[in-house]
Amino acid sequence: GVHLAVGQQYMNMYMKPGETIRTPRMTLMGFTGDESRARNMWRRWYFKHILPREDGQPIPPKMCLHTWGIGGKQEFTAVTEENQVDAIDSYIRHGMKPDIWWIDAGWYPCDFTWTTTGNWWPNPDHFPNGLGPVGKKCEKEGIQFLLWFEPERVHRDTALDKEHPEWMLRVIDEKGGDGYDRLLKLADKDCQDWLIELVDRYIKEYHIHIYRQDFNIAPLPYWMNNEEPDRVGSMENFHTQGYLRFWDELLVRNPGLWIDSCASGGRRNDLETMRRAVPLHYTDIGYGMHHIKQKQHREMFEWIPYFRAHTMSWDQENGEYDDWNRAPRPVDEFAYQCAMAPAITSMVEYNDSDERFAVANKMDPIWREAAELMLSGDYYPLTECRKSVEDYYAMQFEDPETGKGFIQVVRNIKAEPDSFTAKPFADPKATYAFWDRVSGETMTMTGEELQKGFTVSIPKRSGVIWFYQKKGNE
C-alpha cells in the first residue's frame, strides 16, 4: 500500500474568532500505462488547469531581453531611462524585437547594492521621470514590460523599515542584534492593503505587463520567532493567505497582467502559486553550465513546463566550466541549443557585434518554432540525464493533434562517441518527413525505422534540431 501525508510543516494552534486557515493545495493523479503516459497526462492537465493565461489565451513562447550588469555594476542598479530606451532601439534596429523587456533588481535607490530593498520608488538620479517613459516605450513598440519587486524582504533603515516598524518581523540573534533584513508582516491586513495600493499604482503608472516577485529570505525563523504561545503555524498561514490575496487583487485590478514568481530562483513552486504565476526564472544555479541546465530542463519539462533559459556559456577552451563565469563566451549556436525552453533570454547585448546579432537572428526563429511545440506537444526524454559533460542529451516533442514535432540531440563538450542513436517515440505504420532548419537538409523515415533508432553524427559542443511532420497529419 501507499501512505501519503501532506500539510503545513508546523501547525499547532487555536483560532481566534473571525480567523480562517488555509491548507496546502494538492493534486493526486491516477493513471494506467507507463511513465511516459503519466508524464504527458500531467503536462496536459497542467497546461489546461494550472498555467495562468494571457488575456484568456495560453501564454505563447516569449523572448526576453535586458541590460544586465551595465558598467560592471550589480544586477540592474545602473539602468537609466536613457540607456533602457537606447537599448530597446538598438535591439529593434538589429532585428531583435523582444516579447518582454526585463528590468530586474536595482531600479530603486540602493547605492548600487540591489539587496537594499525597502525604498520602493524609482531612483530619481536614473529615472527623473519615473519608469513611465520606459513602460510607454515598450507599449509603443508592442513589447511587454516586466519589472522586479521583492516586497517581503525589507532591509534595515530603508524607508519602509522606518515608516512602518509595526509591520516588521525581526529575528533576534544571541547577541541581541536583529540583522540586516526584516520580513514584511503580510499577515496584517493593513499591510496587505498598503502593498496592494502601492504595486497597483506602479503597474498602472509604469505600464507594467508582467509583475515579477522575488523572495530572497528564509521566512520560517521570522514567523516562528513572532508567534504567540499555542499559535504555532499561525504566522506562516496568515502570511501565505496575505500574499495570495495580494496577487489575486493585482490580477483582478489589472486585466491582462501576469505574474512571474522567482523566490530565489525555483522556490515557492506550489500549486497555489503556480495557478497565479509562471516561474520564468526557475533557478539561480548554472545559467551557463550546459550539462547542469539539461538536468534542470529535464525536470521542468516534466513537472512545471513553462519556464525560461539563458543563452549563456561558462565553458572554457580547455573544456572546464566555471561555477559563475564573469567573462562568458560570446553567444553562439551551442548556447541556443542548450537554452531550448518555452521562454528564452538571449544574452546578445544591445551593443554587441554584427556577428553576434547574426547568430541571434539565425537561431531565434528555430527556438520559437521548437518552443511552440514544447507548449502544444507531448514530451519524450530520449536520454538519461546525469549532469555529465561526457554525455549526449536528447529529447523529443510531438503535437498529438497535428503530428508535427522535433528531435533534438546535443553533444556535450567531452562526449567522446562520434555518433549517437536515440530511440524516439514513433508510430510504426506512419512515415515522417524531417528537416533541419540550420543545414537545410531533409530526409524521410518510416516509423518502423525510427523505432529501430535515429542516429546523429555531430561535432563536440554542438547540437541539432530535426523538425518533422508525421505524414497524413499535415
Features from the language model and the residues they span:
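Beta-strand-rich recognition/accessory modules
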Residues: G1-D55, A78-E81
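Conserved, mostly hydrophobic/aromatic
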Residues: G18, W101, C138, D214, ...
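Active-site-proximal substrate-binding groove within the catalytic cores of carbohydrate-active enzymes
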Residues: T23, Y243-M443, G453, S457-I465
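Aromatic-lined carbohydrate-binding/catalytic grooves of carbohydrate-active enzymes
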Residues: P58-E197, Y206-I210, Y222
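An acidic- and aromatic-residue-enriched active-site/binding cleft used to recognize and process polar
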Residues: G106-Y108, E150-E152, N216-A218, C262-R267
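Histidine/acidic-residue-rich catalytic or RNA/ligand-binding cores of hydrolases
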Residues: T113, D157-K162, P221-N226, R268-P279, ...
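Alpha-helix-loop-beta-strand connector modules within alpha/beta enzyme cores
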Residues: L131-C138, M235-N254
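N-terminal/domain-start segments enriched in small and hydrophobic, helix-friendly residues
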Residues: L198-Q241
